Amino acid sequence: MKAVIAKNEEQLKDAFYVREEVFVKEQNVPAEEEIDELENESEHIVVYDGEKPVGAGRWRMKDGYGKLERICVLKSHRSAGVGGIIMKALEKAAADGGASGFILNAQTQAVPFYKKHGYRVLSEKEFLDAGIPHLQMMKD
């Protein structure tokens, strides 16, 4: 499996495909909320298993930090290391882009995954994003 920075329309479509499968179809996030106004200012990562897109994420600069967003893995490839590949690729891209650390809003069910990757919860106060409970997390 390999992670690539989406550099063309086809790779961007692959990222959106994974996001639609996970967030829209599996988690019932409205499609109009999933694709947002931040797409063009974000750098997108796609993980491929051969030619098949199986994971995705994006990052953008926010207040000097890399804000990691839309991290997702197809159900068929969970527990296969794809999430870790996405995290490493996003963190490297953000660091290369000048980020001094990383922040993200984690679905509460995914908090243990992010803790394994060195993130800490900033506040135990949950908030809803697209109707799903989240916690803000950070890694210096």
From Swiss-Prot:
It comes from the Bacteria. Residues 2-140 form the N-acetyltransferase domain. Its EC number is 2.3.1.-. It is an enzyme of class 2 (transferase). Pfam families: Acetyltransf_10. GO terms for molecular function: N-acetyltransferase activity. InterPro entries: Acyl_CoA_acyltransferase (IPR016181), GNAT_dom (IPR000182), GNPNAT1-like (IPR039143). Keywords: Acyltransferase, Transferase. Belongs to the acetyltransferase family. This is Uncharacterized N-acetyltransferase YjcF. The lineage of its organism: Bacteria, Bacillati, Bacillota, Bacilli, Bacillales.
